[in-house]
Amino acid sequence: MTINLHRPDIAELKPRITVFGVGGGGGNAVNNMINAGLQGVDFVVANTDAQALAMSKAERVIQLGAAVTEGLGAGALPEVGQAAADECIDEIIDHLADSHMVFITAGMGGGTGTGAAPVVARAAREKGILTVGVVTKPFQFEGARRMKTAEAGIEELQKSVDTLIVIPNQNLFRIANEKTTFADAFAMADQVLYSGVASITDLMIKEGLINLDFADVRSVMHEMGRAMMGTGEASGEGRALAAAEAAIANPLLDETSMCGARGLLISITGGRDMTLFEVDEAANRIREEVDADANVIFGAIDDESLEGVIRVSVVATGIDRLASDVVQPSHSKFQKSVSSVRKNDSGINQTASHPQSSQLRSESMVETIESLEVEVSQSQPVEEMFSPKSQIFAKPTDTASTSSRSAATYPFGHGQSDIYGKISNASRIQVNSIPQQSTAAAVSMEATAHVLSEMTNIVEQSEEKQAQIQPYIAPARMPELKDFSPFTHGQGIHSSGLEQGPRSLWQRLKQSLTYREEIEPEARLEPAVKPLQNEESHIYNKNVQKVSSQDSSVYAPHRSTKLQSRALQDQRAFVNEEDQLEIPAFLRRQAN
C-alpha cells in the first residue's frame, strides 16, 4: 500500500491590484509605468485601435469592438467606444477576476477612453472590486468641444467608481519649460498615477514599522468621490517638512483642496536614519490640511535603499468641493451689491426709485468735500505765544501792522487759531482719508459730507465771535524807559538828585528857576498809535482804548495829589538845607 504525501494548497492571501488602461491615453500610461519598473501589480490594456495594441508592453491586451470598428479607432465618438466595450464585456470581466483593487486609467475627450472606461468601471463595481479612476483632461488648444466631451465622460465615470482623480493636461505647463519634450510632459502626468499606485502597493505588500493592509485602504477610498494623490521626497535639513509640503502641493492635480477631505492615507518611507520627530513633523503638517473628523490612516515603512531620504505619500479622498469654493466663498447678495456700487460713477450707491436725484446729490457732495480739502490745506494754524495781561507794553506799530496783516490773510470765516487749527487738521484728515474709489467710502460718503458741513459752519461762527470779542495779543517783551511818560522821567531824575545829600545855594537857585520848565503837560498814557487805514480794524481800536484806560488807572500817577505832595517836600527840604548852610552874618542881617 503506497502512501502519497504532499503539501496542502495554500491560497494566496496577498491583495491583487490591477491597472487597467483604456484607449490610447491609458495604454501610454501603462507603458510608462512598466518602463518605470513598478512591481506587484497586473497590467491590462484595452483599445479599439489594433495598431496601438501592437505597441503595448502589457502582457494582457483586449481588442475592443472587432466587429464594430474592425480594428480602427472610435473616431472621437464616445458612443462607438461604449458599444465596443459592451461587445467585449465578458472578456473584460475575466481579466478583472480575483482582483481586489483596480486602477482604471484613460484619457478623456476621445472616443474609446471616454466611452469604454465607464463600462469597465461598472463591471468592476459589480464584482465588488475597489475601483479607482485616474483620468486626464485635454489641453486647451484641443478645443472646447473636446473639453465638453471629456467633462461629460468624467461625470459618467464618477458614477461608477469609488474614487476619482483628475489630472488636467493644461497643468503640465506649470512644471514644463521650453526644453521639455512632448513625450516627457506626458510622462510627468503618468507619474501621478505611478506614485499613487506605488504608495498603495507598498503599504499593502511591504512590511513596515506601522503596517497597513488592504482593509485600511478600502476604508479610506470606498465610495469617497473625488480624491487627490501626491508624493514628495526630500533630503538634508528639514527634509520631513519639505517632503510633506511637496506631497500636498501637487501642481498637476485638478483645482482641489484637502480642507474638506473625509479620508486621509499617509505613508512615510525612509531609511534607518529616519527619526521619530521627523515622522511626527510630516504627519502633523499633512493632518493640519484636512478636517478634524477625517478618517486618517498612517503607515511607516523602513527602506534601506532610502538612506538620507524621506518619502511622503498622501491619498486624500472625499474632496467634493473645488478650491475656489473653499478659498473664495460665493455670496450672491454681496457680489450684487458690489457690482451695483462699481457701476456708479459718482461713488454713491444709487437707489432704483430716485436715480437722478441721488446722482446730483452725490456729485454736489463730492464737490463740497473737494473744496473743503483745498481750503483746509491752504490754511496754516497760528501758534499761541505768551503775552502779558496789560497792553501798555505792546509796540504800537507792530500792533497796527500785525492787525492789518491778520485781517488780510485770515478773513472772517476762515481765521485760524490754536483751538480751531486742531479742528481744521482733524477735518483735513477726514477729508484726505476718504477713498472715493472704494466701495466702503461710497456707502458712507453722504454721512461724512453732512458731518463735515456742520463742523465747518460751527467753526466759522465761533471764529467770527472770537475775532469781534478778543483783541489782538502782541508778543511779550521787556519795557524800555522810553515807553514811560516824560513826567516819570523827570520824577526819576529829581528823586535821584535828592538822594545825593544837601545842595548848595547855586543848586537851589537853579532848581527854583528850572522847576517850571520841567513840568510838562500831562503825559500821554496811551501809545502813539497810527490811525488804521483798514475799516475792518475799527472794532480793534475800541478794544485797545478800553484796555488802555483800564491800565491807566493802575500805572498813571494822579497829577493833583502828586504835585501837592511834591511842593511840600521841596519846602521842607529848603528849610532844612537853609539851616545846614553856612551863610555869612551880613547876608543874614540884611535878610532879616
From Swiss-Prot:
One of its GO terms (molecular function) is GTP binding. Transmembrane segments: none annotated. Gene3D superfamilies: Tubulin/FtsZ, C-terminal domain, Tubulin/FtsZ, GTPase domain. The keyword Nucleotide-binding applies. Keywords: Cell cycle, Cell division, Cytoplasm, GTP-binding, Nucleotide-binding, Septation. GO terms for biological process: division septum assembly; FtsZ-dependent cytokinesis; protein polymerization. GTP binds at G24, G25, G26, G27, N28, G111, T112, G113, E142, R146, D190. The keyword DNA-binding does not apply. InterPro entries: Cell_div_FtsZ (IPR000158), Cell_div_FtsZ_C (IPR017844), Cell_div_FtsZ_CS (IPR020805), FtsZ/CetZ (IPR045061), FtsZ_C (IPR024757), Tub_FtsZ_C (IPR008280), Tubulin/FtsZ-like_C (IPR037103), Tubulin/FtsZ_2-layer-sand-dom (IPR018316). It is found in: Cytoplasm. Homodimer. Polymerizes to form a dynamic ring structure in a strictly GTP-dependent manner. Interacts directly with several other division proteins. HAMAP family: FtsZ. This is Cell division protein FtsZ. The gene is ftsZ.
